[in-house]
Amino acid sequence: MLDLSLPSGLRDLLPDHSAHLAELSSKLHDVFSRFGYRRVFLPTLERLDVVERGLSPAALADVMKFVEPGSGEVVAIRPDITPQIARLYAARPDALPSPARLCYDGPVLRAREARAGRPREVYQAGVELLGAGGASADAEALVLLARSLERVGLKAPRVEVGHARFAEAVMEAARLPQRLRSAAWEALSRKDRAALGAAAAKGRGSSEAREAVPQLAGLFGDGALDRARAIARAVPGAAAPLAETEAALRIARRRGVREVAVDLGEARGLGYYTGITFAGYAPGAGAAVARGGRYDGLLARFGRPGPAIGFAVDLEFATQALERANGRGRGVRPRRASARGGRAGTRPR
């Protein structure tokens, strides 16, 4: 019997669902354009060395690679579009003066699945602001994300803001033993205050810094900024990340962004993000519908150093949120992996 099934983690999108994704992408690009972002189209394949240059070590396992028959080069199917944007920006300074505002959409393919039911091929639309740093650029990305979520019609969208270096400064000041650092970051990702306290007790830093480590698990919700200020007074290295976060929030609020939450104990994207981070949420979505942040170290890897910030919207999760809000089911699910198959995945964007 002819087997017409798809590989694990992949799926077909039928006309109605495809139309929803196309409509979402069109609405997003309408907002991107109004903010001055210009669209680029990028190839599905890149040389492996270019792709690897732009990924965090944890993301390298997501790369699907093979030898190109014609040239013999090792190439990769893109697992992330941001490194491609960085490569383009570095390769074409004549066409892309700084700062450059670029937007895109398209699929990315990951070798792994992060959890059962999550597709390996993800459809995204996003923006990158290259060559601009500071609170004004941070706020621009934050406002653009909020406006994008509103434009596509999500009900009660919410943006959550953090900073990659706040928790990092506290962990460094606590001087945890090397063998405990990974476990401490994992505990922070689970908001496990007890495990953080146990790790901090073995630190060699000041008592103030060690006491601050378990408090990182509670830096969200009402009063989060007040609690963060108290930590920053005890851990001087945390003061600058907090100030950067508050500066961006002040500008964004002046520009009308209201539904913003804070989580300064965010552990996502360690080693990739260098400043403010953010995520977009909406009722009915299985996870964040958008992720992004500042990644000032990336452009230098491609030979054109400079600050950069951006985000990507997961069109599938956004569609899922809209369909559930309107009572139209649960969206399209991929073929699940077998017990021997992969896991489902997403990158820290």
Curated annotation (Swiss-Prot):
The keyword Translocase does not apply. CDD domains: HisRS-like_core. Keywords: Amino-acid biosynthesis, Cytoplasm, Histidine biosynthesis. This is ATP phosphoribosyltransferase regulatory subunit. PROSITE patterns: AA_TRNA_LIGASE_II. Required for the first step of histidine biosynthesis. May allow the feedback regulation of ATP phosphoribosyltransferase activity by histidine. The keyword Cytoplasm applies. It is found in: Cytoplasm. It comes from Anaeromyxobacter dehalogenans (strain 2CP-C). Belongs to the class-II aminoacyl-tRNA synthetase family. HisZ subfamily. Residues 339-349 have a biased composition (Low complexity). Pathway: Amino-acid biosynthesis; L-histidine biosynthesis; L-histidine from 5-phospho-alpha-D-ribose 1-diphosphate: step 1/9. Residues 325-349 are annotated as: Disordered. Heteromultimer composed of HisG and HisZ subunits. This function is generally fulfilled by the C-terminal part of HisG, which is missing in some bacteria such as this one. One of its GO terms (molecular function) is histidine-tRNA ligase activity. SUPFAM superfamilies: Class II aaRS and biotin synthetases (SSF55681). GO terms for biological process: histidyl-tRNA aminoacylation; L-histidine biosynthetic process. GO terms for cellular component: cytoplasm.
